[in-house]
UniProtKB/Swiss-Prot annotation:
BP terms from Gene Ontology: proteolysis
Listed cofactors: Co(2+); Zn(2+); Mn(2+); Fe(2+)
Family recorded in the similarity comment: Belongs to the peptidase M24A family. Methionine aminopeptidase type 1 subfamily.
Stated name of the protein: Methionine aminopeptidase
Entry keyword set: Aminopeptidase, Hydrolase, Metal-binding, Protease
Residues involved in a divalent metal cation 1 binding: 93, 104, 232
Function: Removes the N-terminal methionine from nascent proteins. The N-terminal methionine is often cleaved when the second residue in the primary sequence is small and uncharged (Met-Ala-, Cys, Gly, Pro, Ser, Thr, or Val). Requires deformylation of the N(alpha)-formylated initiator methionine before it can be hydrolyzed.
Organismal lineage: Bacteria, Pseudomonadati, Spirochaetota, Spirochaetia, Spirochaetales
Molecular function as annotated in GO: initiator methionyl aminopeptidase activity; metal ion binding; metalloaminopeptidase activity
Organism the protein comes from: Treponema pallidum (strain Nichols)
Binding site residues for substrate: 76, 174
Binding-site residues for a divalent metal cation 2, renumbered to this chain: 104, 167, 201, 232
Gene coding for it: map
Gene Ontology cellular component terms for the protein in this record: cytosol
EC number: 3.4.11.18
Length: 255
């Protein structure tokens, strides 16, 4: 069932999203060569507790506050002693439960001297996200977002992960509807309605669209070992516009 949020609930979700945007302000500068991903996760946990929140992923059984995925890791990267290297693409997928309201966003950070093809992957994935958000309007169907995301990726001949997708969010981490990044897949295709809050999250690769789960039971990697990129925003749908609730703050924009 799709959960239509009240204005008061959207206010609560917005507050959670603003806290998450502030977290990214201070987290992204810490993503440097020599840093362990578990150090970044510990920082996220401290920040989230400091604002009165709880790491959202705990409710899903994930044992960390942040999914930190590097290079061939697509999503759900389990923080560990893995050390960030110069040239890495590091995805930071974080959610906050603040007073029962859930935020969800992902930023991908290029570290040091990143290869041109990886920077292009990041640029295009970000373009896909913008296209998906533009297509997310009251009255439009979910697959309009799928088509918009896929069209950008296909134009640049990048792989598009189809096994994972965007989703409703706000009162739980994962709500209906699912929002695929590939059109033509089977499944419901409802219209976006005012009061819906969703996470739009393109996942692109330099190679295959196939993925597998690593031995840790969480980390999803590309089947061919190619580099991946993941970006995500939480957005709220209104009758006359769509609001990006996890929009970067001025600090992050100018950082």
């Amino acid at each position: 069932m799709i959960r239509i949020k009240t204005p008061e609930q959207i206010d609560g979700i917005r507050a959670s999203c603003k806290a998450l945007a502030r977290l990214f302000d201070v987290l992204i500068p810490l993503v440097k060569p020599g840093v362990q991903t578990q150090e970044l996760d510990a920082f996220c946990q401290r920040f989230i507790r400091s604002v009165g929140g709880v790491p959202a992923w705990f409710s899903e059984g994930f044992p960390a506050a942040a999914c930190i995925s590097i290079n061939e890791e697509v999503i759900h990267g389990l923080p560990s002693a893995r050390v960030i290297q110069d040239g890495d693409l590091v995805s930071l997928d974080v959610g906050i439960n603040l007073n029962g309201y859930i935020s969800d966003a992902c930023r991908t950070v290029p570290v040091g001297g990143v290869a041109h093809e990886r920077l292009e992957l990041l640029r295009v994935t970000t373009e896909c996200l913008r296209a998906g958000i533009k297509a997310c309007r009251a009255g439009a169907r979910v697959r309009a977002v799928s088509r918009a995301v896929y069209a950008v990726a296909a134009r640049h001949r990048f792989g598009v992960v189809y096994e994972y997708c965007g989703h409703g969010v706000g009162l739980a981490v994962h709500e209906e509807p699912n929002i695929p990044n590939v059109p033509g897949l089977e499944g419901p295709n409802p219209r976006f309605l005012p009061g819906m809050v969703v996470a739009i999250e393109p996942m692109l690769t330099l190679g295959t669209d196939e993925v597998r789960t690593s031995a840790d039971g969480w980390t999803v990697v590309t089947a061919d070992g190619s580099c991946a990129c993941h970006v995500e925003h939480t957005v709220a749908v209104f009758a006359d516009h769509t609001e990006v609730l996890t929009e970067p703050t001025e600090v992050e924009r100018t950082g």
